Amino acid sequence: DVEIFAVGVKDAVRSELEAIATPPTATHVYTVEDFDAFQRISFELTQSIWLRIEQELKSIKVKSLTPPRDLSFAEVTSSSFRVSWSPAAEDAIAYLVNYTVALGGEEFVVSVPAPTTSTVLTNLFPKTTYEVRVVAEYPEGESPPLKGEETTLEVRGAPRNLRVTDETTDSFKVGWTPAPGNVLRYRIAYRPVAGGERKEVTVQGNERATTLYNLFPDTKYHVSGVPEYQSGPGTALNGNGATEEVVGEPKNLRVSEPTTSTAMRLTWDKAPGKVQRYLRNLHSRSAGGDIKEVTVKGDTSTTVLKELDPGTAYTLSVNPLYASGAGTAVTGEGATLQERGSPRDLIIKDITDTTIGTSWTAAPGMVRGYRIAWQSLFDDKTGENHVPGDTTNTVLRNLDPETKYRLSVYANYASGEGDPLSGEATTEASPDGKIVKISEETETTMKATWQPAPGNVLNYRVVYRPRAGGRQIVAKVPPAVTSTVLRRLTPLTTYDISVIPVYKEGDGKTRQGSGTTLSPFNAPRSIKTSEPTRSTFRVTWEPAPGEVKGYKITFHPEGDDGYLGEMMVGPYDSTVVLEELRARTSYKVNVFGVFDDGQSPPLIGHETTTLRDAPRSPIPSSGLDCTTKAQADIVLLVDGSWSIGRPNFKIVRNFISRVVEVFDIGSDRVQIAVSQYSGDPRTEWQLNTHKTKKSLMDAVANLPYKGGNTNTGSALKFILENNFRPGVGMREKARKIAILLTDGKSQDDIVAPSKRYADEGIELYAVGIKNADENELKEIASDPDELYMYNVADFSLLTNIVNDLTENVCNSVKGPGGLNPPSNLVTSEPTPRSFRVTWVPPSQSVERFKVEYYPVAGGRPQEVYVRGTQTTTVLVGLKPETEYYVNVYSVEGNEISEPLAGTETTLPIPSVRNMNLYDIGTTTMRVKW
């Protein structure tokens, strides 16, 4: 082999030099900057070359020395083994044995003088591989090594100190001190010493004990424990153990075949284990009783106790006897029989539909209790009660109604039951079973229905007759049928009906009921009560079919017929408010249809008044002040019928106050009269009664509630003839206005009176509330309906129309002779923030103009005023791109005209145009647009 040193000069690549040179590169590769730098590395390079020459010479010399041969190992244990070899050359001085753990660790050296060629290496680790090198020593040096490997054995041994504890009849626990070394498992073998099957179990090597189960009782066992290693089994540890004898108690001690005199049989289930004998004890429970003991063979499980006292209770015990001693005794009780008897004098009482009460005279002797058995004679149902021996009565419950039962009372003694005391009884019919239900009533028929009677019914006998007296009618109904139609009855007549089930033995329990045939007059329908207050509530119904002439309403507190209220309303009324009721009281209401020849059956409803009235918010003031020099005569016609009620009439008064408060009241301004109507109209005050607003408002606040039917047509005619006439304040040149407030449909004609209002130039407003007929309101009101007709669903909603109504009535007061509005509205010159408004003034001169404007989308109105000679103005401060409402009014003093209306939209903000950049520098520029 050639050993190469590489020297690189200047630009030589070191990686190429390292690839060329012999390893290691640290002593075989050198680099210099140029040829002049050789002096720097010459000493180091020369020294490396000489060192390698010396090493090679020594290696050549060693190779010439003869090494030992044939390395072998023997006598391997867990901590030692023997190393042997064949001798080297005759001039070998000694042998050096070097050994170390093969995976790395401290190296040990043993010197063996020649000519010895074997040695034992000791104190080794168990189950460990060692690397061994043997070198022959010569005067000239050491030979090359002879190498080999050997592995020590694992540690193996025997467990110690075998222990047997926790012995039972079929198990004991085996424990031991662990065996040395790495035990994989322990194999525990055991068999009876007297001979038998050998069994074994294994446990983990880290366990120190195990329990052997399913052993024979009272048996000695030979036990052996062997540790198992990876390399094989260790040494066994032997010992003995024994199970305990089975000791227990007999089970299920039973007494049978007792007699009235001297004997009873005692039987038990055998005790476990090898019982030698049973010890039987017998002890009378009476004071001073003797204890009798007798033993029987261990294979016996029954015996007869003799020479006993009659009617006597005994305490009994059976105790098993084993070789090791007594087991546990089983105990019980038994008694000889007594003489038995029967109760007497059975009494049956307090019978209901599901119960029967019974009592009897006590049976003789020591009765422990009574069993009362019952059986239905109609079917297979049975049952029984139990009572203590000192009780002589009971109630049989959960029986079937209307059923015949056989009852038997048995006296229960310690020795059994005596003969029964028997009797029979029949339960009553159930509450529903006693009733005949009536349905499908007509004027001449009704249907009778009843619950089926139990048992074998032959038929039902149906008997009915008028309660007021008359001929009795009898019908027969088959047993499978439980209803029938009674025919040929008199209208509006109450009948008493009886249904009797008929049996072979006789009649059963009677079922009774009553029913009334219908009136030939139909009742109203669908009654509804609502709006309860402390003293009122509303009753509403659907009209009765036919030529009804009116409705009668009666009402009284539930359960108190003595306080009966009654009222009548017309045929077109279908609602009424009942008044002057008790607070927090349930009322029953009857609504009858009244016809020419009689009245219908009642339509019945119920309602409860409240403890206190709910607070009502007053209708707010409209805030309008109707300022005008015009004269007007206004007549309010107010519906005061029963359908309104006092609580709602308070709202009506408040509504009237909000309407009339806007006017300037006086003989030269506005005059207001009020008439109230129901069945017959009446004037509350005339046009000229109140000269001031205060006087008028006081009168409205105290307007009384009239009550009655809704006759709107006659009321309209009434105010034409009684309120719109000169003698009571009507002025010829004043504008004439009528306002009707009603909550129902008129029961008389309204077409002709309404036409008279139009003919006489009277403006007529119609305000309908709740139950008002909208078509009727349109017929009454002046045209157009949008201006003169109002209809709200409830009195509380009057607040929603008070402003519109007041404003429209104010305009009617002003009339067409007021200020004329400007005309010909033109908008122009729109910008993003403004536009111009221009108009043509009215024919008459005005003091000034008011221009009102606000966004169409919503917002607070703004206004500007200009002189009466000016007909244009610019509205500024507006929002860009926004549509505005514009109203222009003529203004003269406190009078203001109707508006001249229009719209205009502002322009959007324009974008920048013609932008130029100039004077551009490094950090600045100018912008022009």
Swiss-Prot record:
Coiled-coil-forming residues are none
Start and end residues of each Fibronectin type-III domain = 67-156, 158-250, 251-340, 342-432, 434-521, 523-613, 821-910
Q: Which residues form the VWFA domain?
A: 1-49, 633-805
Matching Gene3D superfamilies: Immunoglobulins, von Willebrand factor, type A domain
Keywords, sorted A to Z = Cell adhesion, Collagen, Disulfide bond, Extracellular matrix, Glycoprotein, Proteoglycan, Repeat, Secreted
Taxonomic superkingdom: Eukaryota
For biological process, the GO terms are: cell adhesion
Glycosylation-annotated residues: 98, 231, 324, 415
Its localization reads: Secreted, Extracellular space, Extracellular matrix
Q: Is Glycoprotein tagged as a keyword?
A: yes
User: Has the keyword Secreted been applied to this entry?
Assistant: yes
One Pfam family from the UniProt entry?
VWA
What kind of modification does the protein receive after translation? Answer: The triple-helical tail is stabilized by disulfide bonds at each end. Prolines at the third position of the tripeptide repeating unit (G-X-Y) are hydroxylated in some or all of the chains.
- List cellular component terms (GO): collagen trimer; extracellular region
Q: How does it assemble?
A: Trimer of identical chains each containing 190 kDa of non-triple-helical sequences.
Which PANTHER family does the entry mention?
FIBRONECTIN TYPE-III DOMAIN-CONTAINING PROTEIN (PTHR46708:SF2), TENASCIN (PTHR46708)
Can you say what this protein is called? Collagen alpha-1(XII) chain
Name its species: Notophthalmus viridescens
